[in-house]
Curated annotation (Swiss-Prot):
Induction: By glucocorticoids. Stimulated by the N-methyl-D-aspartate (NMDA) type glutamate receptor antagonist MK801. Vitamin D and the Wnt signaling pathway inhibit its expression and activity. Down-regulated during osteoblast mineralization. The lineage of its organism: Eukaryota, Metazoa, Chordata, Craniata, Vertebrata. GO terms for cellular component: axon terminus; cell body; cell projection; cytoplasm; cytosol; endoplasmic reticulum; glial cell projection; mitochondrion. L-glutamate binds at N246, W247, R319, R340. Mn(2+) 1 binds at E134, H253, E338. Glutamine synthetase activity is inhibited by methionine sulfoximine (MSO). This is Glutamine synthetase. Residues 113-373 form the GS catalytic domain. It comes from Rattus norvegicus. Belongs to the glutamine synthetase family. GO terms for biological process: ammonia assimilation cycle; angiogenesis; cell population proliferation; cellular response to starvation; glutamate metabolic process; glutamine biosynthetic process; intracellular ammonium homeostasis; positive regulation of epithelial cell proliferation.
Amino acid sequence: MATSASSHLNKGIKQMYMNLPQGEKIQLMYIWVDGTGEGLRCKTRTLDCDPKCVEELPEWNFDGSSTFQSEGSNSDMYLHPVAMFRDPFRRDPNKLVFCEVFKYNRKPAETNLRHSCKRIMDMVSSQHPWFGMEQEYTLMGTDGHPFGWPSNGFPGPQGPYYCGVGADKAYGRDIVEAHYRACLYAGIKITGTNAEVMPAQWEFQIGPCEGIRMGDHLWVARFILHRVCEDFGVIATFDPKPIPGNWNGAGCHTNFSTKAMREENGLRCIEEAIDKLSKRHQYHIRAYDPKGGLDNARRLTGFHETSNINDFSAGVANRSASIRIPRIVGQEKKGYFEDRRPSANCDPYAVTEAIVRTCLLNETGDEPFQYKN
């Protein structure tokens, strides 16, 4: 399996320099979503003092013509800091800074889906919407071949790999453990991880996060995963169906609840929300992957623990349904539900915004409602 040239550099030499004191200066790594809606970019600047909150961080800019976000003749784009985390790569006191992107005219960039999501979340803040997202991904070599798979064939069929233990069942656990610890250090609300059904496929869970913070934490957790994989010389792909055939795809199952759903007899509110979702299936399918449903069409086939992309379904403990109500929620008659439709490469801001629009703002139809300022 091919690994990157950078991973073969002597990391001990690098560490010699990383151990040097940096005085009172702080390194800030600014992170943003590029024009593909899936890729992440980053660059670093120096600050003279340790920022106490994100509001103390300066705005910055970058060349949008090199990130698929603007034309070369008017390429300046603005980075507006919105979330700050500890830097697990350079360590304290350095920071990771997640940013919204704005165009030269101060309007949000086309892939700045956070801007709209924040407005929608503010409208329903009194209902305290909580989200938890289960991010699946697949480890690949730089040649596009799944990590640990035979070079001229396939591993044994699915069955022993989910939550598996052993060198013949778990492929790439070092990367998973490094990512988990880096997220904990950074302050990401990571709550777990496990090996998935397909070999070299893994999952981590983020949440519960309230409102806009769901997207912030998941995007930065993705960034940390890419950086960890960079050090190991491999690639993490969020492609929802990286290997065609009789292999599981990769999703980003999204758990949702409100204060009312979490209280006694909240199951009634859950059932009402599911009924609203059932009447707006195509709107959600379009919101649940960056290509308006085309990526998910490869994954949501009705097989491999998925629903069919053309049909809406719901059930208790049913992993082949669009919406799953966990069995314990059915027993306790309160809690949350799981939307199993979002793809692994979804934008969490688009997913959470769509759920709130339908379930809490009672929107109907195939297009989002345009609210006045």
